Amino acid sequence: MSVDATAPTSAATPPPPAPPEFPTLLGHPRPLWMLFMTEFWERFAFYGIRWALVLYIVAQFFNGDATGQAPAGRTYGAYLALVYAAAIFGGYVADRVLGYQRSILVGAAVMATGLFLIAIPDHTMFEIGLATVVVGNGLFKPNISTMVGKLYSVADPRRDSGFTIFYMGINLGAMISPVLTQLLAEKVFGTDAMPSYKMVFMASGVGMLISLVWFWIGRAQLKGIGAPAPNAQGIGRVLMVLVGCVLAIPVVYFLLAVGADVLQIVLTVLFVGLSVMLLVEGIREGKVQRDKVIAMLIIFAFNVLFWMFFEQAGSSFTFLADNIVDRGFGDWTFPTAWFQSVNSIAIITLAPVIAWIWVKAGRFNPSIPRKFGLGLLFNGLAFLLLMFALSSLVNDAGKVPFWTLFMVYVIQSVGELCLSPIGLSMVTKLAPVRLVGFGMGGWFLSTGIGNNLSGIFAGHVSGSEGMSVSSALSGYTFGFWALLGAGAVLFLIAPLINKLMHGVK
């Protein structure tokens, strides 16, 4: 690809240093597997509470009344949004203050604290616990993803498959966690009618502590990657960041308390500000880097739409499963929580298949924008199936067949495989070298905006009196048309985005 020689280009910025030579395991740097297990346990903790949050809010704070479904969905969306929005600050702390390794360790410790606080059955402590998890995850999540990218050179052909393996760690934790925590909550310490949600939160806290210890023991494998600069290795900066976390928790608590609509304004302002910072840095580095940043920001916008509808999985789909899906198999009832594992099982099963398809496609392998477009379209197909089930398959008891929601999760998973692993790798290739952490933060912030919108949308699906067949059908019909339109537009503008990416694959 020719470059305008009359203008400064990204070549003016020194390329990132080559990673050290690592011993390999199964063809990849050995530290990848340490990061894999660290992320596995963090996702175990995260997804352990995911299935329980909206059900717990309705049961604990609304005495089980269906009118609590809409507020629960909005709280869930706001919490997820803030989890991902906090990544932009975590990226900054790692880039400029603490280094990636110590950011991960501090974040894990703060997250574990928040998970144990959630177990206290008080509304204020519940939201303080959520706020603490948000702050800790902001330090942890973007930086462990960035560490994966730092194990490979930009041109390393193993890079994308390395991110896919890392993504498998995410999904293994997410698969096991709902099953195990549901058994603890309903079979060991509670009943189907009265689950012990406290045990869900406690088990998740223990999982987070395991993640912390695993990374602490294994970080020597990284050979200095992500370590703080020589002038930033003292304990003083760690204490400064811990004080910052303590000060940030009340701010996040306030944002949870003000509601999803106000939060949406805050998140939008943050996204615009971050986009400007990335664009200014891209312009400073030259025309090629500027174009790459523009391409990345366009894809971020479509990422918002994907997650707005995908994250119904943890909110409105949970109420759908609990109230409108026929989960009975003779004398046994399929637990609502276990639907959260379907996505992860599908990811683990289908990820090698999707990867094989991309390899075999050769020159017909879709570009990054078209893969994102496919992700949107598959997400839309899932909503089309829901439309069909709610309009044509409702039985006399007002229930839809089990297989319909099961397949919705599977189809959404195919869409996720087209989009999310590619997105993580894309950011490390397109973001300005000096602001890769901010680039990851932008990816997670766009996901967070989508998550907050998902909570608002879930509230509309549930309605003021709780979810009904008619309210679900109306909401999911809108979801189908929105996703179909977004996917079609992205396919149409894909050639323009490819041009802006200057050969990045």
Question: Over which residues does each language-model region extend?
Answer:
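Intracellular loop-helix junctions on the cytosolic face of multi-pass helical membrane proteins
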Residues: 1-28, 154, 185-318, 323-328, ...
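Primarily marks hydrophobic transmembrane alpha-helices of the MFS/SLC 12-helix fold
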Residues: 103-104, 372
